[in-house]
């Protein structure tokens, strides 16, 4: 990364890495949560993984939005992945070559429209993400944080710690992680 920056200082470079060591985030490194399965369970686990990385000081974390392995995707599941990923520091929709690609137009009109709305929201947030990418973490609030950061002593918050996140400083999102939930909750 440092070599690329010296080669062309006008550009900002980043890499997506499977591993991490302290200090990498200053170089533009992005961590992702690995090759996860296409499932509601995997979607439900991602907020906790992302929050853990952020609490450890890693500013940019992503996942294979939609899941990577398996053919269990449904229009509703993929829509929920898109809606969750639209608010993450890095949105990376990705799947195995053996799976149906996670393109909105392949999942029906209603799901495709909902996924496009999530993508449009993501595009509206691009200036914010670019500003965060250009500003070192100590000089700005984290992009993602737990809602309960000040209430660790209260027992009722322990379970929520893995699923609720405050994104983009002022937006609060709890991603839908079960099929019965029909919309992203906003608090």
Predicted regions and their residues:
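Catalytic-domain carbohydrate-binding cleft regions of carbohydrate-active enzymes
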Residues: 1-187
């Amino acid at each position: 990364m440092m070599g690329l920056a010296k080669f062309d200082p006008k550009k900002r470079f980043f890499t997506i890495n499977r591993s991490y060591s302290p200090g990498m985030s200053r170089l533009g490194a992005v961590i992702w949560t690995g090759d996860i399965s296409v499932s509601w369970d995997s979607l439900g686990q991602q907020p906790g993984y992302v929050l853990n990385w952020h609490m450890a000081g890693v500013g940019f974390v992503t996942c294979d939005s939609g899941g990577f392995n398996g053919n269990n995707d449904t229009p509703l599941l993929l829509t929920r992945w898109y809606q969750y990923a639209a608010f993450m520091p890095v949105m990376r929709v990705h799947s195995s070559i053996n799976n149906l690609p996670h393109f909105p137009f392949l999942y029906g009109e209603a799901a495709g429209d909902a996924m496009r709305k999530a993508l449009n929201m993501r595009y509206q947030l691009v200036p914010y993400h670019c500003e965060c990418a250009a500003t070192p973490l100590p000089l700005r609030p984290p992009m993602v944080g737990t809602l309960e950061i000040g209430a660790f002593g209260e027992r009722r918050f322990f379970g929520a710690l893995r699923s609720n996140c405050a994104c983009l400083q002022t937006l609060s999102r709890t991603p839908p992680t079960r099929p019965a939930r029909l919309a992203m909750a906003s608090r």
